[in-house]
Amino acid sequence: MPHSVCCIVRAKSSPESDRMPYDKDEHNMKLNWVTNRKTTGINRKHDHIAFVLQGGGALGAYQAGAYEELGSTPYQPDWVVGVSIGAINAALIAGNPPQRRVERLLEFWHLVSSGILLLTDAMPVSPWLKSGGELTEPRSAFNQFSAWQAALMGIPGFYQPRIPPPAFQPDGSPGALSVYDTGPLRATLERLIDFDLINSQQVRLSLGAVNIRTGNSHYFDNLDTKIGPEHVMASGALPPAFPPVTIDGEAYWDGGILSNTPLQHVLDMRKKSRSVLVFQVDLFSARGSIPINFEEVLKRQKDILYSSRTRYTSNMVAEIVNTRKAISSLLAKLPQELLDDAEVRHLAEVTNVAPVDLVHLIYRQGPYELESKDYEFSRVSILERWEAGRRDLRDTLTHPEWLKSAGQTAGATQYDLTQHSRPLRGEGEMPARRPETTVVPSVTP
């Protein structure tokens, strides 16, 4: 939540050196090539490809960069799931035809980073600000200043401060419930997203929110709900910064305050007979060092708070895999007459689940990033995060062997193939630094 105040000069133009790393003609050329070719190198065919996006504010540019790379490969997602900023990215993907998705993502991230001081190669300070390098203190100061500006001035096309502030607004009014007005975001969503396309269900879209009255997680899914901008805004209504969104008489907040990683929704809601390849793009890392100052305490707390659901899910389903193994082993020892029993047949059915392959990308923050990183929208930081997403997804896809583990018959195999991991050592094998190699989804009828 923004909590400090500072003013930085607004930029009036976008120099060539600060444009998003996107070549429309090149992207469309690769997309056409992918559309017209056969994916002959893939041994295992997945029934679904899901793109699962965590919440994380300004860090969401990493997800947009990852999609730019993914969108020019054979792995076009047919199911996009998001929470908070992940819901906005997800709606931009599902709400545009393939050839326009990156263009629309680019427009959104260009817009929300247009109000902060831009850095150009003509500025003498830009080399150390752009690269970070060993000069972390100047870059950290710049990042903090841009976060302060976002807190004071708002973000173009996203949110603006309420005047007067909430303390001076009448109880029960929208202005009394949040620091910022998200009216600009609604206008942005209506301009950049084709909601008729979303509701045609060509791509499944699931958006996570929290019902304020019940405290339960709720997913708006275009398979059973007519999606509009209000559903996207409900998923990103993080209190107390943003106001709740009321839909059909129920008020909703940001899904991230309960579960910031929507992986469990995919595992629960998929048909157990359908295999799925999941690209999960997280913005907060569960792993980190012990803080040595108060700023690091705040940053580490936020990382743990918003990444813990992924670890919880992995630990929970790892326990289920042992139960499945025990059941399968027991069933194999039963005589034929018992195998015909209705209860035994039910056990055999629920333990026979199509595989889930989980490709896990996690944003690795720079040493100069602070606790305010999720509301630090400077153009230079957005560009870096976008490029990091492209790079990590590209590096992941240089290991096609992770799709060729045809021997897997159940459960989910998890791969973390980013630049901080060692290359795969064999088919279906995890890098050594990630000991939790196999997990299994919960089973639903």
Describe every region a protein language model picked out.
Residues P21-I49, V210-R213:
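Small-residue-rich anion-binding loops in enzyme active sites
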Residues V81, G208, L277-V281, D357-L361:
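Hydrophobic/aromatic beta-strand patches that form the interior of the parallel beta-sheet core
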Residues W33, R44-A50, G57-L177, G183, ...:
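Patatin-like phospholipase
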Residues Q160-S273, Q280, P291-E296, R300:
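Active-site gating loop/helix substructures
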Residues I292-L330:
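Acidic, Ser/Thr-rich peripheral helices and adjacent loops at domain boundaries
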Residues Q169-D171, A176, P184, L189, ...:
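C-terminal helical/tail subdomains of lipid-metabolizing enzymes
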Residues C6-C7:
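Cysteine-centered motifs
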